[in-house]
Every structure is written in C-alpha cells, then in structure tokens.
C-alpha cells in the first residue's frame, strides 16, 4: 500500500511541481466563528472555553472544514493537509480534551479523504492526496520553560511518542496517503514524532511516505531550538522522507536563502509553504496572491522546488496564483549527494572520505576523568559543563559523555547533564556521543539530544538477536553507531579476528537491518601495550593493520577508538602517554582511522616528540624489537616532569611652534601620531563645537594628503600612516561629539567585504584606508562574508556603494552570485569589484551582465577614490557610467570575437603528446628522510634571509625591483622608509615572538596513472592513500608537449619507484589577532604592515623548506649552492606547484594534501569552504624532483577533459564545471 503511493507521488514529482494547500487557520478566521459555533450541540455544556480550538471543528463544523478543503482543491492543490495541527493529546490538554484526540484525527483525515476522492474522480489524471498532519505540540523537549532551571523539561520524549503514536494510527485509519510532520521548531519533538510514526508503520506492516517540514524562526537562520538548516536536515535524514521542507514563521523573501540551502543539501524532494509575508502591526499578513506568486515563480525557475504551498495568511487565491506561476516550470532535479556520515549538534558535522581526523573529546567521561567524576558525584553540574566546554574549545568536534560509575544513577545523571548541555550553545553546537555499557542509559541519552549523535557502543557479545534489536532502535532514534569488535567468543585481539567480527557485524547492519554503511563506526579494540606481557606486544600493530583491512573491505564504514587505552601502562606519566598517543595516532591515521576518543587539549604533535623518546615509543607501538618495553621504561622517568626610540633634534621639532591647524596638517601629511591627541584637544577647545575640528583642520589636512597621493607625490604606505593619525584624532573627539549629539557629513558610505570562502583582505584594507582618507565612511565586514550578510547590512546601513574583494578563483563565482542577488532583490547601488583574481574581462563578461546598475572593476587602491567620486556625483555619474558601459561592451565584443591564439585538441591527442621522458634509463631519487617532518615555531631569523622583497613593495603600490627600487627617483625614499619599518617589525617578531611560523612537509611513494598520481601509504606501494587529480594542457603544440604534472612522476607500469612531496607553511599564526588589535586602535598602517610581513614570511618559509628538501630531506641536490636571487629565479632542480595556481588550477586538490600531511591537526592551518588557506599568510603545494620538471599553465581545457576530470573525481558535471570554470574554453 505505502510503497505504491510513494512510487505514484514520486513519479508525479519528477514531472511537475506539486501544490500543497494553504492556511487552514486563516480560512477559519474568515468565518468569524463564535464560542457557540466551536461548541456545537455536542459540547454545548463543556466546562472550559473552546473558541480557538480549530481542530475540534472537524467534529462540530465538519461541513465548514470540508468547504475549505474543496476551495483549495478547486484552486489547484494536489495535497490536502488534515485539520489536525493541534490534535495530539498533549496539545488538546489545554481544553481538557485529550480523550478526543484519536476521534479528531480520524474525523479530520476522513473529511480530507472524501474531498480528495471527489476531485480525483472528476479528473483521474490529476490525483489528489491527503497528508495527515502532525504538528509540533505546545511543549519543547529540548528547551526548558523555566529560565531558572535549564535542565527542567515539561514534556518527555516518551510522552511525545505516546501522543504522536495515537494520532498517527487515527490519521492512517481515516485515509491519509502521507504523514506530514510540520512546523518543527524543536527537532527533538520531531525525532520523537518520527520515532512514533516508524513504530506505527512497523506495527501495521506497511509504511506511508513521510513529509518533514521545519521552521526557521528568524533572521538568525536557525530553528527555535538553535539548529542551522543543515544541522536540522542531518538530524532527521534517517527518516528517509519523500520530501524535506520549511514552512511558517517567515515570508518568502526571508525564507529564500534557507530553501536554497535545503535544495542544495537534500537528496530527496524539497517542499516549502511560507507565510504570506510577515505579520503587520495588527497581526495580519499583507502579501497578496500576485506578490507571493512572483516569489514562488523565481524559486521554481532557480531550481529550488518540488512542492509549494502556503502557511499563515495564505488562501485559495494564493494557491491558485502559485499554481499558475509554476505551471510549465521544471521541478528541481534530485542532486547526487556524496556518501558521508552527516552528524549534527546545533551545527552540522560531515565526515566524508576527504575529512581530516575527527577528535572526540573524552574528558566528559566519569571512568576516564577524575575531575569530571568528582563534579558529577558532587552534583556540581555547572562546573561539569565547563569540562565539556573546554573540550570543544580545545578542538573536540564531538564530545563523548559517559556516566557509568557504581555509585551514580547513570541514567538520571546522563539525562540531567544532556539537558543542561542543550542550554549551552558553545557545547551543544557539536554532536554528542552517548557512551555507556548499559542499554537503558544509551536509550535515555538518545531521548535527550535533538541532533544526530553517535551511540557508543553495541556489539555481538550477546548474540545476533540482541545486536539486531539494538541496531534497529538506534536507527529509529536517528543516530550513528560505534560497533565494538566483540562477539560471543570475546574481544578481538588479533588483526584477523578484528576484521572477521567487523565484517560479520557490517553485513548484518547493512544487509539485514538496513543501517546506512556511512553511519557504522567500528572500534576494533585498542589495547594497552608495554604491559610486560609478551602476548600484548603486537596489540598496536594489530589495530593499525586492521584499520587498513576494514577500510579496504567494508565500504563507507568508519574507524574510531579510545586512544588513551594504548598507553594505560604508563598512567601517571602523562608526557610519555601523550608521546605514545601521538605515535599511535600518526600510524593509525595513515591507514585510514577516521576519529578517536582523545583529550582534545592534550594532543601532542608527532614531530614534537623528542627524537630519543619517539624512537623508543615507535619500537613499542610497532613492536620492532624484543626489548622495546624495557628500553621505554628506562627513559620514561626522564620525561615525567616535562611535560625604537630616536631622539628628535630641535630642528626636527620646529613644526611644534606652528599654529594648531598647521600642526594637525603636518602630522597628517607626515603620519606623526606622537602629539595628535594633545593637538586635537587644543583645536577642540578653540572651536565652538567638536565637529568643527573634523570638518576644519583635520579634513583640510586629509585633503592635502589626497591631493598629494593623486599627484603621485605621496605613496600608499604614507597614506595609510596618515589614516592612522586621522583615526586617533577622531577617536579622541567622538565622546565629545556624541555628548553634543552632533552628526558629521561624509562623501558617502561604502560597504567592503571579502566574499564567502575567501580569507584574503590586504588589498581591501588598503582600499578602505584610502577611501577613509578622502572622507568616505567605511563599513568593513571582514573576510568570508556570506552574500546574505553583505546585502542585509547594506540595507540596514543604507550604504551608497558595495565593494567586493577576493583572491582565489572560486571567489569569482561568489561575486557573480552577489550580483545576481542584488538584481533579484532590487538593489540600485553601484558594485565595485577588486582583488588579485578579478579582471576587467571577467567583470564585463560574467558579473556586469547580471546586474542592471554600475559594476566597476577597480584594479588598485589609487583608482578607488576617483571611481567613488564619479559614481556618487549627480554631475559626473551619467558620463562615467556611459563610458564604463561602452568600455565593457568593447571588452565583451573583443572577448566574443577573440580567436584563440592556439588551436584546441582532443584530450586523447593531448595525452598522446605528453612529456617524453625515458623512464627506463632514469632512476628516481629515493628520499634520505621519507615521511612527514614538522617545523613548529620556526626561527624567523632564518626565514628573513629568504624573503623576496619585490612583492612586498607591490603590496604598497610601490613599483620597482628590490633592491634597485631604493634608487628610484620618485619612490626610492619611501621604499627605504617602508623597508626600515618592515625590518623593525621583523626584529620585534624575532625578539617577542609576535608571529609564529609553522610548517610541515612529507615525502611519499608515488606513481603516475594516466593524468593522475597515486600516492601510497608506505614503500610496499600496495595501498593507495590518495589519488592526486591533474589537468593537461589541451592546445595544439607543434614544437612542444602538452604538459601535465603527472608526466614528471614515473608511470606505475614502468616499475620505477618514484616519490612525491607535499608541504604546507604559514608565517601568519597570530597575524589576524595582531592586525585586528591595530585596527581597533585606529592604526591601519601597522595592521596592513603585519599582514604584508606575514605574507613575506610564508613565501620565505616555502622557499627555505624547498631548499632543505632538495638538499637534505629528499637530498637529490645535496651539492646545490644558490644565492637568494638565484632561488627567486628558480634556478634549482625540481618544482613546487601549488593547487589553485596555473599548473594545477583546481583548488579542491588542496584537500588530499591536507589529509596526507594531517595539516590542520598538526600545525593548525585550515581550509575554507572555497579551499582558501587559513591563516591567509600561507603557502602549500607539491614537490617534484625530476630534472625536466618545469612550471607551466594549463590555460583553457575542453569539454572532454571536464567530463574525464569529473568522472575521476567522482563529481557530477555541474560540480566539475563549478570548480573548473576559469579554465573551461568558452
């Protein structure tokens, strides 16, 4: 029965967008019913007021409800919702009508069924369906109604299950085709509802399709209980609904970004039924049917929708206009979502094959933390919450909670603590791992978490029947599961037994229970080593090897383990224990371990373990020698406790005798801050009001600065220093201005932002400073700013211009998105485009055509003032815009008519013309020091010697090559001053440790396979750790090869044992914090200086490390002796191409690099959603050693290569085109 209905509805959904009906309450209000209408004859003498009990009307006014159903069906609705929003026993208790719940649900379904059947009979080609509605109730299972007791709940999970079960049975008996769980503001309520619905389906022997619809309550983009859209989706994905959607609380305008997100992440059909706008001052909804239809049409055309309907304030007319709006528009096509474990707290956590190691915080476990156990025993729950909070702050992405202690009521403690965690967003943002050896404690915990958590753990030790029973319940609760390698015989202690038990459990879970394989997490048992018992010596090796076996044989399953178990023999010596954990995890991660239960605040870095200790630990962990335990014990005790001022002469201070107005001008032009506060105060005392100081001498001085800069007589570093002086003066005046309620005038208000996914902002900061110097008010939103935030702030602050910045190529697509959204939302502000990756051609061809108001490419800071002046001037703007549009038209025309200088070739032909290397006569050099090497807090004095200063001067718009720039007639003196300031900063960085440089590199066995490169786990070359995907030049090359990076690595079939290197370095640890401090002080000069110096240190680190790799670590050029200039000119053997740059332009290839090196866990560098590196002052890439290797640019590729790349990466074509866009021909 249920499967036939689902197949029928799915077939309809693939053909067209289906219509859900609109607001039931809105229509009932239109009848203006009185108390007696609600009572009817049956309830005439009921003891409480019944007006407002809309669900009761299915019994007292059935014809009225049926009339409303008919009106919606006539308007075009395909799906009718039953009038049961508040019909559960819990909600009906407000009227003392709990006993009527079943009858009301049945009657409501029957009324809707009759109406639907009448319309289906009239037109069988358009069948009508009934959705049995299960509303949210008036209670919240994950939020306390008592602000004084955040752990209190006024309804339990079990009470909700009981209420929803009764309603579900009645809705099905009454004739519902679907079950709609809607208006979900507390996800835990919805999980209880879904649990009830699935239980009833099992009881009845068939399942109806389930629709789920949540409610984003406000502009925060979260449900009332705090979840983001994706976290909410992950929490209920286990229901496998026919549709996932959003409804109520917001109108279509406000709801749009969340529907868009849902359409992107949902693997099932997407529905939405928004309100008719937001309620006005009288609680009424103002959005007309025509206006709402316009929104709906745009959503449909954007590919967001499969089902559309209405909620509060909507009527049959709204549905009629929606039906007309979506008629003929193709429904959203279901996307292919990569297989991944998708967990959630208040925020999502996706663990995919390219995710780095996941830390599970272990300190909220009474069996593993004496402090936590004491706090729970003494009922000091607030302090116990601090333990959880510390784990998250220290990097735990999941927290494991265990209350198994003989003197505790584990079930009560688990419930109390989880309820309190739910009230702490800093804790509850991460998923929860419910950990207990008692099934009743696990179930109690699952009934408290609204997100998708993990059960730790179940096993086969009590036999298959118990195992299956528990697994089915875990799946119904919507959790992932850890499965211990434990059966009736006992715990698996050998490699073979671990694989045998895990395979058996996997087949039962996946094949019989229907458990998603990506939600199965095996714990193959980590046992203590170095116990003195010979049989235990190989325990770590068995685990490490079993990890590789399980990852190979059991698709999508993950591996976890309690890491501290391995070092239990050394309890009391934390330093040695941490060293054992570091070594053990290093080898486990290389073999594919996904997560581990660890103390997130005490993870040691593998390469930071002293060499003597590390070697002894490796002997133990890898069981390399018979006396390994004795040797480690001998040295363990050694580690038990380890755990500018220049004196101004009289002539230089002559300006101090001038008038205060002239002193202020001089200070601004020269960038002198020493006397600015006292001079500003003197000027204030002389003025009739504080604002006169800004609009008088200060702006006069800044006008001089602007004129000198425009004439090329002042340079950018000087202008930034001037801005610092101006900001300090204004900061002194602001309290006086505020006190007198004065408001100054500016030339205009400009919003600047680095777009979502991008972390680079030096150029944006410089533009902001230059504009401030010319009396523009700047609102700087910083980096990684989402489109909706940019446009929201622009509206709220009523800005005059929006400026977007970005460095990496994915930022170009985000800029196009912002332009489209500005057009859709009716903005008429000018849009400025800037950043290293932008260009006039891209702006003209890709961005400007999506926005009908001025879009201006600004290629440097000095041009920004003139552009803004022209755009905001009534006199200058028309001519400026006319010239701009003519210029862009010319650029587009040239782009369209441009004949490629080179002829494209097929991918097959390009591959046939690969670099010709005689591999048989070449022996690839084996590295002297294979593996991963970490350089933490590296010596800045060493890096200074490798700095290439020429780009540093370009950052400040001083053009010239170092060191000859110092002799330049115009910019030489300023370059010298800038160079001096930079070196003073480098001195401070060395002496005070203000910036940290961290880096790492690794050398791995590798072989090329076509255009890709296989990187192996070890020198046996039997297991592939990662595949690096490369692009090949695809233009005709009569005299040369069509280069691809894989050409420089020995082919697999050659039998040659080649290697590849990877590196990641940063010079910017603490850079953002320092820069922000200076900005807060109004010191833009030093804020930009620290970023520029950090950038240079990162590039210098990359240069230094490559040299060291060539000479020592790989050692293929041990005799190399090059000057810094020769290094800059790349006179060495080998190359270090970086993902995102010409030879390998596709940014997602940074992901495998991060995983091979374990970058984020080891040195703290991370990747944004657009694969920009954080900190911004970072460099990463690959090392190739072949003497013929050279840099090249991929340039334009053809469709056949796009398709090949997509197939190799496991992407659909749209995903490939998104990331390869800048390189796709045409």
Curated annotation (Swiss-Prot):
Cofactor binding: number and manner: Binds 1 zinc ion per subunit.
PROSITE patterns the UniProt entry points to: ADOMET_ACTIVATION, B12_BINDING, B12_BINDING_NTER, HCY, PTERIN_BINDING
Domain (B12-binding N-terminal) spans: 651-745
Q: Into which EC class is this enzyme placed?
A: transferase
Database matches in InterPro entries: Cbl-bd_cap, Cobalamin-bd, Cobalamin-bd_sf, Dihydropteroate_synth-like_sf, HCY_dom, HCY_dom_sf, Met_Synthase/Corrinoid, Met_synthase_B12-bd
Catalytic activity, per the record? (6S)-5-methyl-5,6,7,8-tetrahydrofolate + L-homocysteine = (6S)-5,6,7,8-tetrahydrofolate + L-methionine
Check the UniProt entry and state the signal peptide residues, or none: none
Report the residue ranges that make up the Hcy-binding domain in this protein.
6-326
Q: Does the keyword Disulfide bond apply?
A: no
Record-annotated AdoMet activation domain positions: 898-1226
Q: Which residues form the Pterin-binding domain?
A: 357-618
- The segment(s) forming the B12-binding domain are 747-882
Q: What is its EC number?
A: 2.1.1.13
Q: Give any extra note attached to this record.
A: L-homocysteine is bound via the zinc atom.
The protein's role, per its UniProt record: Catalyzes the transfer of a methyl group from methyl-cobalamin to homocysteine, yielding enzyme-bound cob(I)alamin and methionine. Subsequently, remethylates the cofactor using methyltetrahydrofolate.
| Protein name from the UniProt record | Methionine synthase
Species annotation: Vibrio vulnificus (strain CMCP6)
């Amino acid at each position: 029965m249920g499967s036939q209905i689902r197949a029928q509805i799915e077939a309809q959904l693939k053909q067209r967008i289906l219509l859900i009906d609109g607001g039931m309450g809105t229509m009932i209000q239109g009848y203006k019913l009185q108390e007696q209408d609600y009572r009817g004859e049956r309830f005439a003498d009921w003891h409480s007021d019944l007006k407002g009990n809309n669900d009761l009307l299915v019994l007292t006014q059935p014809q009225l409800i049926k009339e409303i159903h008919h009106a919606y069906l006539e308007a075009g609705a395909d799906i009718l919702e039953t009038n049961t929003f508040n019909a559960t026993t819990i909600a009906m208790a407000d009227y003392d009508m709990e006993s009527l719940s079943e009858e009301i649900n049945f009657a409501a379904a029957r009324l809707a069924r009759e109406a639907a059947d009448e319309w289906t009979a009239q037109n069988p080609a358009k069948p009508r369906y009934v959705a049995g509605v299960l509303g949210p109730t008036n209670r919240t299972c994950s939020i306390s109604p008592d602000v004084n007791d955040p752990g209190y709940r006024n309804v339990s999970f079990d009470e909700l299950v009981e209420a929803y079960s009764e309603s579900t049975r009645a809705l099905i008996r009454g004739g519902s085709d679907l079950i709609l769980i809607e208006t979900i503001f507390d996800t835990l309520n919805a999980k209880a509802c879904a649990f009830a619905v699935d239980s009833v389906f099992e009881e009845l022997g068939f399942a109806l399709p389930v629709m789920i619809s949540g409610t984003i309550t406000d502009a925060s983009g979260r449900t009332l209980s705090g979840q983001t859209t994706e976290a909410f989706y992950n929490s209920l994905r286990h229901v496998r609904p026919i549709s996932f959607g959003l409804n109520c609380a917001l109108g279509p305008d406000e709801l749009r970004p969340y529907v868009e997100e849902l359409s992107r992440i949902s693997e099932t059909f997407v529905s939405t039924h928004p309100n008719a706008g937001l309620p006005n001052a009288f609680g009424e909804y103002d959005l007309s049917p025509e206006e709402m239809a316009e929104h709906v049409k745009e959503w449909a055309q954007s590919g967001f929708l499969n089902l559309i309907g209405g909620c509060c304030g909507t009527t049959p007319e709204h549905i009629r206009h929606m039906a007309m709006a979506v008629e003929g528009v193709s429904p959203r096509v279901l996307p292919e979502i990569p297989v991944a474990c998708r967990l959630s707290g208040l925020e999502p956590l996706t663990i995919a094959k390219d995710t780095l190691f996941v830390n599970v915080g272990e300190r909220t476990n009474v069996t593993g933390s004496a402090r936590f156990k004491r706090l729970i025993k003494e009922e000091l729950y607030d302090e116990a919450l601090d333990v959880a909070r510390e784990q998250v702050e220290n990097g735990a992405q999941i927290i494991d909670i265990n209350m198994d202690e003989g003197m505790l009521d584990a079930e009560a403690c688990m419930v109390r603590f989880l309820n309190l965690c739910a009230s702490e967003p800093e804790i509850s943002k991460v998923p929860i791992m419910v950990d207990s050896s008692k099934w009743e404690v696990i179930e109690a915990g699952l009934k408290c978490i609204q997100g998708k958590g993990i059960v730790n753990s179940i096993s086969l030790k009590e036999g298959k029947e118990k195992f299956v029973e528990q697994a089915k319940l875990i799946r119904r609760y919507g959790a992932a599961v850890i499965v211990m390698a434990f059966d009736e015989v006992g715990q698996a202690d050998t490699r073979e037994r671990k694989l045998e038990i895990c395979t058996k459990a996997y087949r039962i879970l996946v094949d019989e229970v229907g458990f998603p394989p990506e939600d199965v997490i095996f714990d193959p048992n980590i046992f203590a080593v170095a116990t003195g018992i010979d049989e235990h010596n190989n325990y770590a090796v068995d685990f490490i090897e079993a990890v590789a076996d399980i990852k190979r044989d059991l698709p999508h399953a993950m591996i976890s383990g309690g890491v501290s178990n391995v070092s239990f023999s050394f309890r009391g010596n934390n330093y040695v224990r941490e060293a054992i954990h570091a070594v053990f995890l290093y080898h486990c991660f290389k073999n594919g371990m996904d997560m581990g239960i660890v103390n997130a605040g005490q993870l040691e870095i593998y390469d930071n373990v002293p060499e003597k200790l590390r070697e002894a630990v490796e002997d133990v962990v890898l069981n390399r020698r018979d006396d390994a335990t004795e040797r480690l014990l001998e040295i363990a005790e050694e580690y038990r406790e380890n755990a500018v001022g220049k004196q101004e002469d009289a002539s230089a201070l002559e300006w101090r005798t001038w008038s205060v107005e002239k002193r202020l001008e001089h200070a601004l032009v020269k960038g002198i801050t020493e006397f600015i506060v006292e001079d500003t105060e003197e000027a204030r005392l002389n003025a009739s009001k504080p604002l006169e100081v800004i609009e008088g001498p200060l702006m006069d001085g800044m006008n001089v600065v602007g004129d000198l800069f425009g004439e090329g007589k002042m340079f950018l570093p000087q202008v930034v220093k001037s801005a610092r002086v101006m900001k300090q003066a204004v900061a002194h005046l602001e309290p006086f201005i505020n006190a007198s309620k004065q408001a100054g005038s500016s030339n205009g208000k400009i919003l600047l932002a680095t777009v979502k996914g991008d972390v680079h902002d030096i150029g944006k900061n410089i533009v902001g400073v230059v504009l401030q110097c010319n009396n523009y008010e700047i609102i700087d939103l910083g980096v990684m700013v989402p489109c909706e935030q940019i446009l929201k702030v622009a509206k709220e602050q009523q800005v005059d211009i929006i400026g977007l910045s970005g460095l990496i190529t994915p930022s170009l697509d985000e800029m196009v998105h912002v332009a489209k959204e500005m057009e859709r939302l009716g903005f008429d502000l000018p849009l400025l485009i800037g950043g290293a990756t932008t260009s006039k051609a891209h702006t003209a061809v890709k961005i400007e055509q999506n926005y009908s108001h001025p879009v201006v490419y600004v290629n440097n800071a000095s041009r920004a003032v003139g552009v803004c002046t022209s755009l905001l001037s009534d006199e200058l703007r028309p001519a400026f815009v006319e010239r701009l549009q003519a210029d862009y038209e010319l650029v587009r025309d040239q782009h369209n008519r441009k004949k490629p200088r080179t002829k494209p070739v097929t991918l097959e032909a390009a591959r046939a013309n690969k670099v010709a290397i005689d591999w048989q006569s070449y022996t690839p050099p084996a590295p002297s020091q294979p593996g991963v090497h970490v350089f933490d807090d590296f010596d800045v004095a060493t890096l200074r010697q490798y700095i290439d200063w020429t780009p540093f001067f370009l950052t400040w718009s001083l053009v010239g090559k170092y060191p000859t720039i110092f002799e330049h007639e115009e910019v030489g003196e300023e370059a010298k001053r800038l160079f001096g300031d930079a070196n003073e900063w480098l001195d401070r960085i060395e002496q005070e440790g203000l910036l940290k440089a961290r880096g790492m590199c690794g050398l791995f066995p590798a072989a090329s396979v076509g255009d890709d490169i296989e990187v192996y786990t070890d020198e046996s070359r039997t297991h592939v750790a990662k595949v690096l995907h490369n692009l090949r030049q695809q233009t005709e090359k009569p005299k040369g090869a069509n280069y691809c990076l894989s050409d420089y690595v020995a082919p697999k079939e050659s039998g040659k044992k080649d290697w590849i290197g990877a590196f990641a370095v940063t010079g910017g640890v603490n850079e953002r914090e320092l820069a922000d401090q200076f900005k807060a002080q109004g010191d833009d000069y030093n804020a930009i200086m620290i970023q520029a110096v950090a950038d240079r240190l990162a590039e210098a680190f990359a240069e230094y490390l490559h040299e060291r790799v060539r000479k020592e670590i790989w050692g293929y050029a041990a005799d190399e002796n090059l000057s810094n200039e020769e290094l800059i000119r790349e006179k060495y053997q080998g190359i270090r191409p970086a993902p995102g740059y010409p030879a390998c332009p596709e940014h997602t290839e940074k992901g495998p690099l991060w995983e091979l090196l374990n970058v984020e866990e080891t040195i703290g560098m991370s990747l944004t959603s657009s694969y920009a590196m954080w900190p911004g002052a970072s460099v990463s890439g690959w090392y190739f050693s072949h003497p013929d290797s050279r840099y090249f640019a991929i340039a334009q590729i053809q469709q056949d290569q796009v398709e090949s790349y997509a197939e190799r990466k496991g992407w659909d074509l749209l995903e490939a085109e998104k990331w390869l866009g800048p390189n796709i021909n045409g």
